Amino acid sequence: MGDTAPPQAPTGGLGGAPGAGLLGGGSVTPRVHSAIVERLRARIAVCRQHHLSCEGRYERGRAESSDRERESTLQLLSLVQHGQGARKAGKHTKATASTATATAPPPAPAAPPTASQTAAPAAPAPPPDYHHHHQQHLRSSSSSGGSGGIDGEQQQQPPASTPGDQRNSALIALQGSLKRKQIVNLSPANSKRPNGFVDNSFLDIKRIRVGENLAAGPGGLPVNNGQSQMMSGTLPMSQVPLRKTAALPPPPTHSPGNGLFNMGLKEVKKEPGETLSCSKHVDGQVTQENIFSNRYGDDPGEQLMDPELQELFNELTNISVPPMSDLELENMINATIKQDDPFNIDLGQQSQRSTPRPSLPLEKTVIKSEYSPGLTQGPSGSPQLRPSSAGPAFSMASSGLSASSPIPSVPQSQAQPPPATGAARALPSWQEVSHAQQLKQIAANRQQHVRMHQQQQQHQPTSWPALPSSAGPSPGPFGQEKIPSPSFGQQPFSPQSTPMPGVTGGSNQSKVMANYLFKASPSAQGGPLDVLLQPKPQDLSRSFLNNPHPAMEPRHGSTKPLFHFNSDQANQQMPSVLPSQSKPSLLHYTQQQPQQSSITVQPQQQQQQPQQQQQPQQQQQPQPQQQQQQQPQAQQPAAQPTQPLSNQPLLRAPLPLQQKILLQKIQNQPITGLGYQVSQQHRQDQHSVVGQNAGPSPSPNPCSNPNTGSGYMNSQQSLLNQQLMGKKQTLQRQIMEQKQQLLLQQQMLADAEKIAPQDQINRHLTRPPPDYKDQRRNVGNMQPTAQYSGGSSTVSLNSNQALANPVSTHTILTPNSSLMSTSHGTRMPSLPTAVQNIGIYGNLPCSQPSTYSVTSGMNQLTQPRNPNQLIANQNNPLMPRPPTLGPSNNNNNNVATFGAGSVGNSQQLRPNLTHSMASMPAQRTSNVMITSNTATPNWASQEATAKQQEALKSAGVRFPTGTTTAYAPNQSLQQAVGSQQFSQRAVAPSNQLTPAVQMRPMNQMSQTLNGQNMGPLRSLNLRPNQLSTQLLPTMNQAGTGLSQSRTVSQPPSLAAGGFPSPNQSSRAFQGTDHGNDLAFDFLNQQTDNMGPALNSDADFIDSLLKTEPGNDDWMKDINLDEILGNNS
């Protein structure tokens, strides 16, 4: 009959005028909402018809089960008396059916007994339907007396199903009376489930209802509650049992809620209340029976009838269920993860709960950090070692933040809060122990694990990508912290890397790195970034973010200890952590640094461009990162805005601890002390210089410069960095706007100058003359000067670092110079170090190509150009940065092209670069020594270098693989890969790819950077060295985004040159490094677009036109008329 009832549903809906009449008033309007209202009306009519059929069936069933009702009444009484004893005895299938149906799966057994007892499956179910409807009708009519019997029956049934009915009724006696009515309304499902039992219990409940009214009612309620509670753990079960017990799936959480829900539905469907009740029960039955299809013989019919109502109720039920899911998830997370609150805080701290997160971060840091290792469970052990000690060492003050940093990225990615929870759960087991233990072990193991973790992080490139996702915000702090500290930075960076590689370190690194970055070097991000970015925050954001990190990290992986020293410039910090992670990690790190770069740079003049560009970068970088690290997307975007905030709370709070850690790490790393101590001096210089440079953002620069200059090493610097962090972030915000405006103005001026230089670009593409150098200087000085406002300081600061490193590690700088220049190139700090090397080293190696060929001199000279990171890197510095950045990708070209930073390039370019570099180093060294102006001379030098590079390119020496290899040793990890890849690419496709590739990176960069890179990319499209100059600031950022997008587009390069890829992009956009960018298809094209474009404007235009369809928008922004006019 249930089957016939559903067929009647349409009939009822259509012909059930009375039933529809109840809703008929709104029939016209429902017809407007015909799909829903008609279904509801049809269901109501069907429910009424079904109620009638159920009523008839119920009457028949009652007649049939009158004996069974008596028996069940006696049995129910005995069951109520005996409680579970009778139920356990299960003498009657009703009791078993009740229990089974209440349990949920057993409805099948219950249905057979019910069917047997009812004699007809359809007959049993219909009577329950009628009974339900009758109960609902009584309930809707509020006739507790009438419903008393039904309620009593149903209530008695729940008692049968629940052993503790009397106890529950005693507790719920009063509530039970009300809830019992509601639950009885719900319990019709229960009574319906055992049709015979329901029928019996209906009569029996009438009898029992007097004495067992409360007990049965509460019993019924407890049954629902028991199921609800039992099932609340398992939402599906809770819903199902509630559907069983409550007959309404919607109130799975609360059986009273079921009644309330039914009441609400009744009120909604007030007129057909009985029908509604019936339909509800039918729906509840249907849901119950859909879940337990065989519970009632009538179920199929009801299900057929109720599917839509069931959907509606299921939606309502789902509505109620999600809260259950949320609460349950929270409870599960809290229960499963003791650190769940930290987890939530982590999720919220950077994204939503930033306030609690600082306090919880320590716990959550481990979870988050461990979660990052969870992503990298393989390296998780090492992250755990590091996280437990090194990570929590940071997590002492910053482990929470570290964890929150990586996991907040998860919240930011908030597809992952559950994964984070799962990962946190997986990790919590370790982390639960390591929260306290880690903090304890952190102090003891912190130093060892800092070093170990650095190594481990080198072994954690895989976790690095995943971790940055979880450590999305962490990348910001992480990137910040990464950049400044090479060794400490690495250690904190490793922790910070750890969220990326290890996780614990992630947020801890965030904090610790923040401490390092912001404490010792308030801007690990800012300092190196500022150092790098101040000269050209845009280029730095790209070339530094992209290039310095990759270069640094690859090199650092190659010459980790050296980069410890040099990474004192924050390059090592990342490389040492990232050597193995550098490929995936470098992207994160680079991406994080771009965030930080945008953060740091944003406070600087480039804040707007870095933000605009870096945001696209971060958007695009997350794409590669998404490929490698999906979370970094949220990390960077969220970290960029969040990072200042998270850095402040995350970094500031842990600053004292991290100061201690930094001091300890500094003590642990006295070797870096050479660079760091000198760097500290330089850091102070950098503070002063960067303060001068940063102007509004001296604190970011001091932070970043101190970072670069072993900022964390200095507790003074740490204190300064702490203060500077607040000032920095505040100034960053202010300077972000100011410098964004300045950057926009500069970009506009650069674009205007680009237009004029485009003529010279045409000349200088072939061979950038000194005029173009001057123009580039002007452009570079305009942008870089503004960008380099801290650039001179950066150069000076890094020069100081470079002095410290070159002086202390002059020999190291020879290998390290590549490494350092890579490291420095990798990070702007390296650039300044290179700049200092150019100043100091520039004096030493600058004039001396051999010294410069000691990649330190050349690379650092180049990288001081990288400090002009746009400028220097655009030409030779561009190459060194691509070498740095492109250790794998651009390194090849960078090294070869720059030769400067690169040994091979140093050698080949040394003939050219060396001569030119001898001259250029003279110039550039002067320029680099000039630092800010050096950046401009670096542009000029880059022009010369670009000429030389082009000569090398056209000579085929372009970027000698030897250079790449020479540089690769330094950047062996990524440089070898990217260098070889790009050396191959760079050598062969340099001219060919450059036109098209150049356009591609330009397009991607412009696209990546969107409007922001567009202007610089337009300049890039203009493709004069000046274009590189102007573009490179943006394009370094764009390059970062581009290389990151390229990293996306070029995962292979990304792997090896993932960060090199960004660096490459930076390099690619850094003028001459377009040749270096040759390493990338995009950047190679750009680089060679410099070359080929230099060689032929037609090729450049062809590359613009042919490289990508995306060039259309990009070309629109570029003003092909200008390019064509200049190039034609």
Curated annotation (Swiss-Prot):
Note on domains (UniProt): The C-terminal domain is required for transcriptional activation.
Subunit structure: Interacts through its N-terminal region with the ankyrin repeat region of the Notch proteins NOTCH1, NOTCH2, NOTCH3 and NOTCH4. Forms a DNA-binding complex with Notch proteins and RBPSUH/RBP-J kappa.
Subcellular location: Nucleus speckle
Biased composition (Gly residues): 12-22
The organism's place on the tree of life at top rank: Eukaryota
A Pfam family it matches: MamL-1
Region of interest (Disordered), ranges: 1-22, 81-167, 343-509, 521-649, 677-714, 758-794, 1039-1073
Function, in words: Acts as a transcriptional coactivator for NOTCH proteins. Has been shown to amplify NOTCH-induced transcription of HES1. Potentiates activation by NOTCH3 and NOTCH4 more efficiently than MAML1 or MAML3.
Lineage: Eukaryota, Metazoa, Chordata, Craniata, Vertebrata
Protein name: Mastermind-like protein 2
GO CC, alphabetical: nuclear speck; nucleoplasm
Membrane-spanning parts: none
Single GO term (MF): transcription coactivator activity
Gene Ontology biological process terms in this record: positive regulation of transcription of Notch receptor target
The gene coding this protein: MAML2
Gene3D superfamilies: 6.10.250.970
Positions where Phosphoserine occurs in the chain: S177
Flavoprotein is among the record's keywords: no
Record keywords: Activator, Notch signaling pathway, Nucleus, Phosphoprotein, Transcription, Transcription regulation
Listed InterPro entries: MAML1-3, MAML_N_sf, Mastermind-like_N
Family the entry assigns: Belongs to the mastermind family.
